[in-house]
Regions:
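The feature captures the conserved acid-bearing segment of alpha/beta-hydrolase catalytic domains
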Residues: 164, 172-252
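C-terminal catalytic histidine-bearing segment of alpha/beta-hydrolase fold enzymes
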Residues: 243-301
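Short substrate-entry loop that stabilizes the transition state in hydrolases
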Residues: 55-103
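A domain-start/cap signature at the N-terminus of enzymes
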Residues: 22-64, 139-142, 146-149, 158-160, ...
Length: 301
C-alpha cells in the first residue's frame, strides 16, 4: 500500500472507531499521522485495529490481543481467523504488518526485535489516545512462526506489559536463562546481556507471572527449515526447540504449558487456533496462587 493511501486508511478507521457507534468490523489501518512517529524507521508497515462487537457500549477497559504474523504475512490477513474468537472474548485486535528481516541470522534478530518491541510497546501505550477506547494495562499476545519468536521476546523484554502469550510454531527461542550447559547465553539465544538490548536486565520476578502457552505441530520436524546456530542449545526441529523452551520455563518456575498437535505441520490449524485462544481467554480470569499449574492440558509427545 502506498504510504499516502496508508495515512488516509488509518485516518478513516480511527474516525470510525472513535465515533459514537463503534464499527464491529475492522478496516486495514496503516501508518497514519498519530501512528507514523511511533513506527517510523521500523519494519512495521501498518497496524490493523479491530474493536470487538459491543465495544461502543463497553463499561470496562478492553483487553488487547496483539496478533503477530509470520514471515511474508500481514496483520489483517492473520487476524481474519481470529475475529470470531475476538468477539467471543471481547478482545481489541491489534495486528501490525511487519517486514521482517532475515530471521535465520542471529545478528539481524538481535538488531530487529528490540526495535520492534520498543515500537509496539509505545504504540500500545498510545492506543487509548489513538482510538478513544480504554484498554487494560497488560496485553495478550498470539504469534505464529516468526511472530511467535517476537511474541515471547516481547514478554522477556517487557513482562510488565504482558498478561499471557500463546506462541505457535516458533523456529527459534530466546531462553529465559543467562547460561546453559555450554556457557553463557547472550541474546538472541538467552538473556545474559539483555540490558544491552532492553535497557534493563532480565526481570525474572515479573516474567514468571506471565502465563505461557507454547504450541507446535507434531509433524513440524523438518530440520532444513531452521537456522543451525540454535542446534546445540535447543535442538534441530521446531518440536525439540519448543520442548527446550518449555524445559527452561519450568526450570525458572514460570507458568507454562506445552501442547504438541500430533498431525499438524507448520500451518496454523483450526484446532491450534482455538486452543490458543481458549488459553488466552482463560488467562483473563482471576489468577490462582503463583506456582499453581495452568488449567490447559499438555498433549503427550
Amino acid at each position: 500500500m502506498p504510504r499516502t493511501l496508508g495515512l488516509i486508511s488509518l485516518a478513516l478507521i480511527l474516525a470510525a472507531i472513535v465515533s459514537p457507534v463503534v464499527s464491529p468490523v475492522g478496516t486495514a489501518a496503516a501508518a497514519g499521522t498519530g501512528v507514523s512517529s511511533l513506527i517510523a524507521g521500523t519494519p512495521i508497515r501498518s497496524v490493523y485495529v479491530r474493536p470487538p462487537r459491543g465495544a461502543a457500549t463497553a463499561t470496562k477497559p478492553l483487553q488487547v490481543l496483539l496478533a503477530l504474523h509470520g514471515m511474508g504475512g500481514s496483520g489483517e490477513d492473520f487476524s481474519k481467523e481470529l475475529v470470531e474468537q475476538a468477539d467471543k472474548y471481547g478482545w481489541l485486535l491489534v495486528a501490525p504488518t511487519i517486514d521482517y528481516g532475515d530471521w535465520t541470522n542471529p545478528s539481524v534478530v538481535a538488531r530487529e526485535d528490540p526495535v520492534l518491541i520498543r515500537a509496539l510497546a509505545d504504540y500500545l501505550d498510545q492506543l487509548p489516545q489513538l482510538t478513544g477506547l480504554q484498554t487494560r494495562r497488560t496485553v495478550l499476545i498470539l504469534g505464529h512462526s516468526r511472530g511467535a519468536q517476537l511474541a515471547h521476546r516481547f514478554a522477556e523484554f517487557r513482562p510488565d506489559k504482558v498478561l499471557a502469550v500463546a506462541a505457535l510454531s516458533a523456529g527459534a527461542y530466546t531462553l529465559p536463562q543467562a547460561s546453559g550447559p555450554q556457557g553463557g547465553l547472550s541474546f538472541p539465544y538467552g538473556v545474559k546481556d539483555l540490558a544491552a538490548y532492553a535497557g534493563h536486565t532480565f526481570d525474572a520476578s515479573h516474567f514468571d507471572r506471565v502465563q505461557f502457552w507454547v504450541g507446535v505441530g507434531g509433524q513440524d520436524t523438518n530440520a532444513a527449515d531452521l537456522p543451525r546456530q540454535w542446534d546445540s542449545i535447543e535442538g534441530t526441529t521446531r518440536v525439540q526447540r519448543a520442548q527446550a523452551f518449555e524445559a527452561a520455563m519450568k526450570q525458572l518456575g514460570a507458568n507454562s504449558v506445552l501442547r504438541v498437535f500430533g498431525d499438524a505441520k507448520h500451518d496454523v490449524t483450526g484446532e491450534m487456533r482455538l486452543a490458543a485462544c481458549a488459553f488466552l481467554g482463560s488467562a483473563m480470569a482471576p489468577r490462582a496462587p503463583h506456582g499453581t499449574p495452568l488449567a490447559a492440558e499438555p498433549v503427550a509427545y
